[in-house]
Amino acid sequence: MSKVIIIGGGAAGMFAALGAVDAGHQVTILEQNEKLGKKIYITGKGRCNLTNACETSEIFENIPRNAKFLYSAIYGYDNFRVIDFFEEHGMPTKTERGNRVFPVSDHSSDVIATLQRTLKNKGVTVRLHTKAEHLEIEEGKVRGVKTSNGTTYPADAVIIATGGYSYQTTGSTGDGYRFAKKSGHTIAPLSPSLVPMTVKEDYCMPVSYTHLRAHETLSDL
């Protein structure tokens, strides 16, 4: 049984852990925060809009750039499989305006609880307050992960699931890019995806992260 270390215990890290353990591996999640899924708690205004019930092909129509890059990932585990996963593990869902899918309870904590319970039932080891510091690489292969407290976790494979740079207060500080670069990967230039817009002026910075329902009108010029 090979050992798989997953750096990061967010949504991607937890689902990666479930996939790895189902494939017969011994899995450990290293999470620097005090709990798993910290960013999940704040998604969908605390309700967790966990996926969309539209046809899978429609998802790509709403990705602003390089949608083809996501083809294999999304078709490999599409939005309907996500819904089925939570339903099968005891968390009913509902679909609202715009085909947005939420837990019936309207609590993002139920999404996390479902994932945590499934991880525990499948025997995944979780190490909280454990910050990955760097990868142990020998002869071009990753052999383990060294943490900030000096502990080294040996591994046959390492999955980087640290998130990007957004909402750094949740722990997304870009460590994954550093790990990937050290292991030989090339890092492409980063740019926003949710709102792919660059603004020259700085007067709009105070309204960053402000949500509102907007309307626009075009007149005959």
Predicted regions and their residues:
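Short hydrophobic core segments
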Residues: 153-165
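Short beta-strand to alpha-helix junction loop
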Residues: 71-77, 99-116, 167-171
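Single conserved hydrophobic/aromatic residue that forms the stacking wall/gate
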Residues: 211-221
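Glycine-rich FAD pyrophosphate-binding loop
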Residues: 22-40
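Residue-level detector of alpha-helix initiation sites
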Residues: 6, 10-11, 35, 164-166
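N-terminal Rossmann-like FAD-binding beta1-loop-alpha1 element of flavoenzymes
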Residues: 4-28
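Glycine-rich active-site loop/strand segments that organize a redox cofactor
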Residues: 47-93
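A conserved short coil-to-beta-strand element within the FAD-binding core of flavoproteins
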Residues: 128-141
